[in-house]
């Protein structure tokens, strides 16, 4: 942003005097009413001033004698006062700083006529004093940030463009004999040839400071962060793949659980059946040494009441029986004999006992002895006795 130009008080005085001299020069010249500009081409706001000034200046030219030439008399005194440029640090607190370019007093401009022949000097006020005030105000405010009073070239007009003709709004009231034309409302967007209209940017107020934040620190590890993010993305994809595989095998896990449940039920059934077998075929109790059981075995008398079954064997045993009068007598007179058993296929029972001996007997000599007995057995009772012996040896 370019720096604004600065001017001293003397330079401002010279510029103001030069502008006022230019205004005096153009206002003091005679104006031909017939060659003056038309009312329609004069900007609104100063039409009456320029019209009255032109008509007033045209009357002496047409009727009176030739006026003498005018010569501007420059006075050494300053017609206005410039605001004192007091340093800001010497002002009281919360005191606004005055603008040194704005005058404190604005006296009305004066016109001086000098007759060269007679040397008479006449003074009077300007006929177009309003126009002089307008030019003076423009000169005073052109070096400041304040917006000019004049409506010409306003920044609020979006169709304003430097170098082009200003587009003014339609006048609501009539001027003289001219009336308002209510015609087409379509306006040309360009007022100077083929150059398109460019909206002027709004002026920035000097009273609104710009808030500036500190610049962010430079990111020196951007590449490392990007590589880290890529690695995390790759790991996330791997985890997602594994999760998909786990979800795919969830059905297999459910099937395995169902099979385990059925196996547990089967094992429980087998345990119940084994318990039933132990109850039906009792043997030695558990957690009892075999030596103690063998010591407790001894011969005892057995009393049989009633007729004996065919499976009972009483060979080479002294028996005492009861006669008809219920008197005990030795068995020498009467011997109980076993009834012959019917022939039965014992192959399956022998194979079962051989497998039982192989599974339950750990010592090879004992195992061989039981296998020999099983093969030599011819009746079911012998096989049952061998079975009991195998179970006792296994405990």
UniProtKB/Swiss-Prot annotation:
Signal peptide: none annotated. Residues 178-217 are annotated as: Disordered. Residues 220-283 are annotated as: Multimerization. The keyword Phosphoprotein applies. Keywords: Host cytoplasm, Phosphoprotein, Viral RNA replication. It comes from the Viruses. The N-terminus consists of a long intrinsically disordered tail. The central part contains the coiled-coil multimerization domain (PMD). Forms a four-stranded coiled coil structure. The C-terminus constitutes the alpha-helical domain that binds to the nucleocapsid (N-RNA complex). This is Phosphoprotein. It comes from Human parainfluenza 2 virus (strain Toshiba) (HPIV-2). The gene is P/V.
